[in-house]
Amino acid sequence: MHRILIVTPNRKRLAEFAQTLIEQQDVEVAWADCGQAAIADVMKHPPLAVIIDDNLLDMPGIDLVRRLLPINALINTVMISDLSPEAFHEASEGLGLMAQLPPNPTKSDAREIWARLKRMSAMSVAQPRK
C-alpha cells in the first residue's frame, strides 16, 4: 500500500482530490492539519509522498518542506500554491519539490500526481542494466 500524507488545515477543500487518490490502486491517504503533526507522522510512518498546503496552522508550507528534508530527503513533496510558476520556482529552488498544485486541485490533478508518483517509484526500484 502506498501512503500519501496530505497536510492542510482545510480537508473539505481537498476532499475530492483526496478521494480520487484513494480510488487509485494501492493508495492510502493520511491527513495532518499542521506542520508539527506532519513531521511526527513522517517520522513514524514514512509516506511515498507528502502533499502540503501553502498555509498551515503553525508554519508556511514551504517551511515544512525545508524541515522534512533532513528527516527523509527521499520523500516526494508536492506544494499547493497560488504563486505563478516563476515565483514558485524561485521560492522552492533547491528543495526538490516534485510539483506545484493549484489552490483547488481537481480529480485530474490527483490522477496526474499519482501517475507521476508511480513512474518515479518504478524508476527507483528498477534494476540496473548489465
Predicted regions and their residues:
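Conserved phosphotransfer cores of two-component systems
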Residues: 43-45, 67-74, 95
